[in-house]
Amino acid sequence: MIPILRASDAGELKRRVMNRSQLQNEEVSRIVKEIVARVRQEGDAALFDYTVKFDHVTMTAETVLVTKDEIARAYAAASPEWLDAMREAARRITAFHEKQKQNTWLNFDPAISLGQKVTPLKRVGVYVPGGTAAYPSSVLMNVLPAKVAGVKEIIMVTPPGRDGSVSYPLALVAADLAGVDKIYKVGGAQAVAALAFGTESIPRVDKITGPGNIFVANAKREVFGHVGIDMVAGPSEVLVIADDSANPRYVAADLLSQAEHDPLAAAILGTDSETLAAAVQAEIARQTALLPRRDVIEKSLTAYGTIVVAPTLPDCADIANQIAPEHMELSVADPYGLLPLIENAGAIFLGHYSPEPLGDYLAGPNHVLPTSGTARFFSPLSVDDFVKKSSLICCSRAELERVSEQVMLLARQEGLDAHANAVAIRFGKEIKA
């Protein structure tokens, strides 16, 4: 049963939640470093060797690329209702991310014109896990912001099944709907390395996004600096702040929707109501017994599920800001009144009819969110992740001459005489021997 704690015990809760990540594993790190180094040096030979070793299937340069026929077969396996829902999700995700676009701007001035040039990345790679973890919704969330940003080429990698086909065909449909240009049947750390450095079959990308297991996450961290990455995601979490206006059945259902993800997922309720805390605790027990993934749910709730009773809602907000959850629900009578107190959260769901699964699939904002407390300094995946920005400076001769003495003074103060000379030489004041 999910425990009920007092606010004074929230420090222990924070420690448990923040320490869930399994990324700090020396043996995994060693294996990943070896895989990345081999793929970087040997290209396809190493990539396909690891595919045989880990996925138990032989791939070649001729078979690794997903064909149009494979995509057509995937469409045939999709129900019309699911396709309609995916198209609606894609429409909403695209519309939301269109509002994030920034254009190049330049403030023209006779003295000095300043601005910023916004340029889409040339090529992006999206990692999609295999099997039951190949969520088509994640394909949309990773690809559509890149399309909105204007990325010229988007390629996807996903592990093959033992028969050589993509292990979860609906991921192919999602990729096609989102506008992926090429899909390769490779997975694991070796696929991340192929994207980062390129092989004979797979082109090098500028950035890698998408979720994966501990090997994929470590591989992304290993190649960061050679390419950009979205983030190194840890286990998922939700924190619900609720008062007496909340329906305990709804709150319990929302907590369980997170707990069913993974034994490492954290589902937390913060409330100022003893009555609600007890009612939600009972509802969680009742609903868990009805759910097919109850084994996962029970492990998650036993390890990381908690109900915290605090004196006031602002106290709940303070606890929430310390945890900095991936998802936060404000299931209170006045969510907009509480919102200014929330500083650290990946996504915030306001009111009794904004459950976290709505954001997972159809609302429009991105569901790729900072986890494990990183909402203190990271943001959701967005259009900004798929562009780069260059500063623009165009100075007139008169303006440069006007500020030249100050520029040269600052340069010389830092011991950089060549910097000062680059200004001085334009006005007959260059350094003399």
What are these regions (language model features)?
Residues 231-303, 307:
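A conserved active-site cap/scaffold subdomain adjacent to cofactor or substrate pockets
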